[in-house]
């Protein structure tokens, strides 16, 4: 057993506090140095986030950096002297929405010229000149690997100096930053474990906006989870563009692992080892992870999920298309048959595992047979839920350079409707299978439709709504399921649960 001891004393602004890590690895106890944050906030900042869970996690890192520089995070943009939008580039619709919000915020700026507006995240590289120089609708542009430079960029903007940093890093993971949970329910939290991606799917901008794949030091991951546990959090989601390819060998890009020393290779930590470590270190904490790429998910990970109750029985496993021809054009490095084999393995080892998906319909040259292949794969798996989109060509991606976007919008919409309708049918089938069963639910928040009811999730990531009674947010409750919709289970609370 290793004991965490924190020595406290009165700190001056220039001093630092040293936190000893309770996790010992390879015979050494690591330490994280955190700057003391001021107890007096002199400025206010507003952060608005779009897109994937990673963006929302990044916004919590940004909030921490700003807090260390005397900014209070506010939920009201009209109260802020600094307005930041953490942006998403995955679809054109998201970019259009962000542009609209920038115009809204510039109306605020007309009444107060001291307000500074910044764009963060995946849009930064592509729009830096357009938004900053041509349209002049932002003052600051910051890429995903440059958030530590924000205080410097803010000062530049105040002095009318170009404030841009979109440089991608080979080693930045923000492992030394303690995130501020600005959008949290104080029960569930995101914990980033990897950044970037090496897969180069032809439809995706992530490798160009977030850089090459690198993994975070497991010591800093354990430290962050330890802090969450002490604050009363009950659930965490391990985040990465591709969590299953997590690989720690002392730091550096995953692609450089072949050049590592024999000792580094021997002591390296893969995702299954990290998952086991976290499950054993925090047995009372629910653990989720997202997202998995089918080509990288191993049998070892599935077995670890099977062995530990606190690892949630849900896998988000995007397949994008059921057609081998389209998968190849997408540069997805698995076949339909290999994907089905993986599904069979999951069902065999974890029969009650919830499985969700991502699907892109209308990819260049997709024909009716390709579409039918997608529908037939859905019929085979019968997913619990999924995220379904029509293909949106993104500038700078390999697909935009190699393929003509030649599937009409009408056909895309029709195919998407068919996919959504089929998924709703399958979701209802999965939901009805819970009726009559008593299942453990983590209470998260009020139901959207009634303040007299709680909303929470099962281990399969299924939403459950039930009467509040004497239970509270953060409780694990056994709920007997009475009815359902295609998206929600409805039940009666029985008692506090002995499970998680």
Segments the model singles out, each with a brief description of its role:
Residues 183-187, 197-199, 311, 321, ...:
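Short flexible coil/turn linkers enriched for glycine and charged/polar residues
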Residues 5-19, 34, 399-500:
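Terminal RNA-binding accessory module
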Residues 148, 199, 244, 295, ...:
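Glycine-centered loop/turn positions within well-structured domains
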Residues 240, 291-293, 319-321, 357-361, ...:
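Active-site proximal loops enriched in glycine and acidic residues that flank catalytic Cys/His/Asp
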Residues 117-121, 126, 230-368, 379:
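Conserved SAM/AdoMet-binding glycine-rich loop
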């Amino acid at each position: 057993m290793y004991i965490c001891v924190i020595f406290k004393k009165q700190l001056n602004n220039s001093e630092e506090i040293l936190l000893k890590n309770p996790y010992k690895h390879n015979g050494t106890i690591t330490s994280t140095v955190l700057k003391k944050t001021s107890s007096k906030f002199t400025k206010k900042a507003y952060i608005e986030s779009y897109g994937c869970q990673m963006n929302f996690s990044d916004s919590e890192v940004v909030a921490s950096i700003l807090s260390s520089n005397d900014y209070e995070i506010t939920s009201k943009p009209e109260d802020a002297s600094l307005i930041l939008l953490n942006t998403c580039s995955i679809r054109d619709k998201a970019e259009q929405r962000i542009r609209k919000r920038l115009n809204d915020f510039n109306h605020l700026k007309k009444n107060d010229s001291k307000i500074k507006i910044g764009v963060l995240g995946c849009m930064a590289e592509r729009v830096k000149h357009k938004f900053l120089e041509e349209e002049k609708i932002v003052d600051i542009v910051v890429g995903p690997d440059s958030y530590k430079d924000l205080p410097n960029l803010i000062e530049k903007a105040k002095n009318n100096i170009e404030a841009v940093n979109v440089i991608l890093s080979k080693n930045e993971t923000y492992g030394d930053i303690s995130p501020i949970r600005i959008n949290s329910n104080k029960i569930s939290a995101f914990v980033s474990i990897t950044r970037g991606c090496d897969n180069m799917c032809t439809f995706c901008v992530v490798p160009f906006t977030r850089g090459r794949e690198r993994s975070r030091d497991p010591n800093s991951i354990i430290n962050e989870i330890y802090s969450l546990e002490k604050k009363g959090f009950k659930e965490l989601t391990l985040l990465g563009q591709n969590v299953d390819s997590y690989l720690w060998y002392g730091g550096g890009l995953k692609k450089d692992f072949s050049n590592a020393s024999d000792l580094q290779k021997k002591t390296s930590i893969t995702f299954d080892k990290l998952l086991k470590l976290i499950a054993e270190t925090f047995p009372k904490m629910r653990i989720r992870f997202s997202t998995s790429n089918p080509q990288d998910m191993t049998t070892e990970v599935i077995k670890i999920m099977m062995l530990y109750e606190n690892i949630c029985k849900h896998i988000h496993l995007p397949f994008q298309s059921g057609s081998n021809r389209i998968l190849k054009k997408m540069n997805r490095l698995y076949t339909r048959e290999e994907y089905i084999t993986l599904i069979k393995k999951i069902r065999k080892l974890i029969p009650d595992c919830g499985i969700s998906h991502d699907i892109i319909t209308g990819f260049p040259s997709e024909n009716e047979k390709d579409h039918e292949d997608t529908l037939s794969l859905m019929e085979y798996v019968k997913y619990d839920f999924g995220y379904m989109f029509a293909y949106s060509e993104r500038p700078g991606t390999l697909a935009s350079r190699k393929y003509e976007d030649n599937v009409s919008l009408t056909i895309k919409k029709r195919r998407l409707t068919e996919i959504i309708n089929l998924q709703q049918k399958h979701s209802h089938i999965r939901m009805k299978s819970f009726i009559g069963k008593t299942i453990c639910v983590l209470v998260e928040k009020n139901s959207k439709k009634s303040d007299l009811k709680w909303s929470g999730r099962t281990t399969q990531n299924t939403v459950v709504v039930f009467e509040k009674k004497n239970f509270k947010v953060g409780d694990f409750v056994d709920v007997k399921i009475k009815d359902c919709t295609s998206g929600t289970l409805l039940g009666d609370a029985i008692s506090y649960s002995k499970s998680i």
